[in-house]
Amino acid sequence: MSFPYEYIFKYIIIGDMGVGKSCLLHQFTENKFVPDSPHTIGVEFGTRIVDVNNKKIKLQIWDTAGQERFRAVTRSYYRGAAGALLVYDITRRITYNHLTTWLTDARNLTNPNTVIMLIGNKKDLEGQRDVTYEEASAFAKQNGLIFVESSAKTGENVEEAFLRTAKLIFQSVQEGNVDLIPDGGITKNPPQTITDKPQDASKCSC
């Protein structure tokens, strides 16, 4: 068989409960908004193949639960993440105030070269905004994060968030800053094409 992609990048999505992590995952992988998406219990998983610099890359995305009682379980999924999407709700300051705790976990439990993207979600609710763009941008700059505001409902900047993260991970690969091993969150498929040996029809029992 031949692989339809050359690399696999592991992502995790982290942040408080109700910030729209699962909605971001569904919007990116299925191009749809699920308004009544139930709160994630443990983890949820999704994949999508994207094109970065003419290379096919499979993104394996782990959406983690935001509730405190699941933190011990979800922390195990941080290991080996090549990219981390740190999400808060621009209409709920409490979710922004908790970013430092989430970021500390990400820094302690992932790799030094993990790309961390800060996402201010629910941009479609501008009239209810409780965290300014400038404030979050300053936080991102201070902590060396990439930053974007998005809307899982309208799809605004969702694609950009995932793809921009993938481009920075791929850049690290090209520069030799990361190891191509599963524990590093990045796997490279063999360059050769593997062909299944056809079965001898004369030996088939039909």
From Swiss-Prot:
Entries under PROSITE patterns matching the protein: RAB
Organism per entry: Dictyostelium discoideum
Keywords linked to the UniProt accession: Endosome, GTP-binding, Hydrolase, Lipoprotein, Membrane, Methylation, Nucleotide-binding, Prenylation, Vacuole
Function: The small GTPases Rab are key regulators of intracellular membrane trafficking, from the formation of transport vesicles to their fusion with membranes. Rabs cycle between an inactive GDP-bound form and an active GTP-bound form that is able to recruit to membranes different set of downstream effectors directly responsible for vesicle formation, movement, tethering and fusion. Regulates the fusion of phagosomes and lysosomes.
Mode of membrane association: Lipid-anchor
GO aspect biological process, one term: intracellular protein transport
Compartment list: Endosome; Contractile vacuole; Membrane
E.C. numbers: 3.6.5.2
Family: Belongs to the small GTPase superfamily. Rab family.
Keyword Hydrolase: yes
GO cellular component annotations of the record: contractile vacuolar membrane; cytosol; early endosome; endomembrane system; lipid droplet; lysosomal membrane; lysosome; pathogen-containing vacuole
Regions of compositional bias (Polar residues) in chain numbering: 189-206
Name of protein: Ras-related protein Rab-14
Residue span of motif Effector region: 37-45
Catalytic activity line of the entry: GTP + H2O = GDP + phosphate + H(+)
Modified-residue entries (Cysteine methyl ester), positions: C206
